[in-house]
Amino acid sequence: MANNRQQKPVRYAPDRIKEFPVNAPVKLMEHLSASMPDRKRTFIKQLLSHNQVAVNGRPESQFDLELQPSDSVKVNFTHEFKVFNNRRLKIVYEDDDIIVVEKGYGLLSMGNDKKPDNTAYSILRDYVKWTNPLNKIFIVHRLDRDTSGLMMFAKSMEAKEKMQHNWNNMVLNRVYVAVVEGEPAEKEGTVKSYLVENSRYEVYSTDDPKKGQLAVTRYRTIQTNGKYSLLELELDTGRKNQIRVHMHDLDHPISGDTKYGAEKSPLHRLALHAKTLRFIHPITRQIMDFSSRVPGGFMSITR
């Protein structure tokens, strides 16, 4: 016999989270004590030990952590903040409007019909919904699957639209590092062309401005052993496969990039990493500046 009893709806009780702005350099414990003068130190220590304090979006238990005025400190009085742990994606910074991550190589930024899940987007979507099922994540820009490094996601439609509708003015600087085959004749220089994408989704250069989109890449040699060189690359424009095409045009393809002429893949990956991301925060208008380490293999193979 069917059970006709009406089941009670499952109701979500949001976390009680409070933010305590940092106005001057101070240690975390001192800041929390000053922000909650009616609370005993033992209570604050429990919050820290139970992952209920987050600094820049990440749970923090170090009571003597040095804080700066740009830091975001939040306390969850309901339960612990989720500890984000994913070997292919690292959260570098988080606030109410944006998340900056370091993506590992081999991970899609966003899925498609064939591979909708196990992407940077899906991982972060599940993460933000853990705190509140109504939370959302929005992709603002992408990195190629085989490119590692820094990228930013929006947590609100307002942040997404402000970044995307004014991208060239909001993004102040993007710097990549790459290992290329051989050694460029000039230690530094600029590659300029117009990029075209054909019906097979292949991108290539043309000198005809009527056929493609302007792409400008500036490069500088950091170190070289003649066989491989480590380059720093700065983008004046952001086109699909821009760096890969321009290094091919320079006759020094990126190591591991067999699609654009590389002979070998000694690092067993595309040797391209988004190292620096500097932009204007879409809501606070504060300048945000993030840098990541050059992958170790990039350094060793070019010595």
Regions found by a protein language model. Give the residues of each.
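Pseudouridine synthases involved in rRNA/tRNA modification
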Residues: 1-46, 209-216, 223-226, 236-303
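Short, surface-exposed secondary-structure edge patches
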Residues: 62-66, 232, 269
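Short beta-strand or tight-loop elements
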Residues: 87, 135-136, 176, 187, ...
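N-terminal low-complexity/disordered regulatory or targeting extensions
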Residues: 200-202, 277
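Well-ordered beta-strand positions
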Residues: 92-93, 144, 196, 220-223, ...
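RNA pseudouridine synthases
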Residues: 1-199, 297-301
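Short histidine-centered loop motifs in beta-beta connectors
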Residues: 57, 226, 231-234
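Conserved hydrophobic positions within beta-strands
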Residues: 91, 180, 218-221, 254
